[in-house]
Regions:
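Small side chains
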Residues: 13-14, 53, 294, 460
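Sec-dependent bacterial lipoprotein signal peptides
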Residues: 1-20
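Residues embedded in well-ordered secondary-structure elements
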Residues: 10, 55, 81-83, 95, ...
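Detector for intrinsically disordered, low-structure N-terminal pre-sequences
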Residues: 3-6, 54, 60, 161
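Beta-strand/loop edge motif enriched in small/polar residues
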Residues: 114-496
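Beta-rich interaction/scaffold domains
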Residues: 21-120
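Short stretches within intrinsically disordered, low-complexity N-terminal or propeptide regions
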Residues: 15-16, 76, 98, 108, ...
Length: 496
């Protein structure tokens, strides 16, 4: 009986130790803060840990009920759904699963006259083109301006929209089109955002079209702008073929995508934005443009919550730095080719999702630097596990800088050639450092080595394999390395 008791005690101790060793989440963000009555969504500035909302004139702020969304496994105090007195700023404490905490200060103000309520009179209706510099001030109305149809800003005209303005569109053809030499400046504030909204009789995504920018003017700025229910006919709410700075903006609702950046488009800044309830939040048509995606962006409740990469070539002499935006990057069509003399740097926590039979090619004299960590590995996977991609084909012979560290390369193995059937194919003259990676599952092999005689150019440690159906390592060509002879087609359990 004593022996049984000892075994039981040891078993319970082991279970307790395993449970205590499990790493707990440290995520502790407020992702969304809104009220159902009145229907107001607050602006969250993550860098400052502030929450700001303006409620309509006459609102009783002594018992407002916030609806709060926080990070997975985190809690918030005061809790979501509980009445709170917002007469003065209120501190909300978010506690992560691991017990760490962060405070946000919520300031709720009542709009006394402007920015959506309090004024009298009729809104100004606009239809047609804008051909001279024009400013739309806040008229202090629930709706200050109504745009009927398609508005084209032409010539060298600049449309400036001031803080607190609300613009309503009359229907699905409602659109602002900024010409090649024109500009648009919408800079609101946290307390007085600029709002572009749907007509009263259509409170659905896609109720109006959006804004398209063709010009490269530095005036093109969106700050604290709310785009509500745009994106008609599956268009993006914001489409940029020119230059745009976009900060602290909200896109809520679209029958299409949130933001599309075309080949000629450039973000001068993209940070602290929230895109929600759209198809894809971001659609990017040039790989190097991904470098500008900044901090503090949130992507919530989207039908396909991924950033689309619709570009095969990272052109010569260009650099793409891929940051962790909290959602995957979806590589459509054929995949990615990092061309000669170009460079891709992938930060910790990034996840790439590839279409069926897509590939990731690292060309000669290009550079790939994958900087995963133990807690935030970089993931390369297929969109659907049953539809494999062709893996990473690594040909770069650069003498320094090529690194894949803490990556998981999985769901690989399809195509007619051996180089397309591995998670990582290492070309004959490739120079590369591989550390702490996981290769597999793969329908064929985890790693393929083209020329074993040049294996001295590869440094490796801490790599593992899982689920490689035809063996972990494939030696493609006969050769010798480190005094040992390898046969063509030989399978190894580990890297030599």
């Amino acid at each position: 009986m004593k022996k049984v008791s000892k075994v039981l005690i040891l078993t319970l101790a082991a279970i307790t130790m395993l449970a205590s060793c499990k790493k707990q989440s440290s995520e502790k963000k407020i992702l969304e803060f809104k009220f159902a009555s009145p229907a107001v969504e607050a602006v969250i500035t993550e860098s400052a840990k502030t929450i700001v909302a303006v409620v309509p004139f006459g609102t009783d702020v002594t018992a407002l009920v916030p609806i709060i969304t926080v990070s997975n496994k985190a809690t918030v105090t005061p809790a979501s759904g509980v009445p709170v007195n917002f007469t003065n700023p209120v501190t909300f404490t978010v506690t992560a699963e691991d017990g760490s905490q962060v405070n946000y200060v919520a300031t709720i103000t009542v709009d006394q006259n402007g920015g959506g309520g309090g004024g009298t009179g009729d809104p100004t209706t606009w239809s047609g083109n804008i051909s001279a510099n024009t400013t739309w001030p806040d008229l202090g109305l629930d709706v200050d301006y109504i745009i009927d149809g398609w508005t084209y800003i032409e010539g060298n005209a600049l449309l400036t929209i001031e803080p607190g303005v609300t613009i309503m569109f009359t229907g699905t053809n409602g659109h602002i089109d900024v010409g090649e030499n024109a500009g648009i400046k919408m800079v609101g504030t946290a307390e007085k955002p600029i709002r572009l909204v749907n007509p009263l009789n259509n409170n659905n995504p896609g109720a109006w079209r959006g804004i398209t920018i063709h010009s490269n003017r530095n005036d093109n700025q969106f700050e604290y702008v709310e785009f509500i229910n745009g994106g008609s006919d599956e268009n993006a709410v914001v489409a940029c073929e020119g230059k745009l700075s976009m900060k602290h903006c909200l896109i809520n609702g679209s029958s299409g995508n949130g933001v599309e950046l075309y080949y000629t488009g450039v973000f001068t800044a993209f940070e602290n934005n929230t895109i929600k309830n759209v198809n894809y939040p971001l659609w990017i048509n040039e790989l190097d443009k991904l470098s500008v995606l900044g901090n503090g962006n949130s992507y919530l409740n989207n039908a396909n919550n991924m950033i689309v990469i619709d570009d095969y070539y990272l052109d010569e002499q260009k650099t793409a730095t891929i940051s962790n935006q909290g959602i995957p990057y979806y590589v459509i069509n054929n995949g990615i080719n990092v061309c000669e003399n170009s460079k891709m740097i992938v930060n910790a926590g990034v996840e790439f999702v590839f279409d069926y039979e897509a590939e990731f090619i690292i060309s000669e004299d290009s550079r790939l630097e994958v900087n995963g960590t133990a807690s935030q590995p970089v993931i390369f996977r297929a969109k659907n596990a049953e539809d494999p991609w062709r893996g990473i084909l690594f040909w770069s012979n650069r003498t320094t800088g090529n690194l894949i560290n803490y990556a998981k390369i999985m769901n690989c193995g399809t195509g007619d050639y051996a180089s397309e059937r591995t998670c990582l194919w290492i070309g004959s003259e490739a120079k590369l450092t591989l550390t702490n990676n996981v290769f597999g599952p793969s329908n064929y092999n985890g790693v393929g080595i083209d020329d074993i005689s040049n294996w001295g150019n590869v440094t490796h440690s801490g790599n593992t394999f899982t689920g490689c159906a035809e063996g972990n390592v494939l030696i493609w060509n006969y050769g010798e390395y480190n005094g040992q002879t390898y046969e063509e087609g030989q399978i190894l359990n580990d890297l030599p």
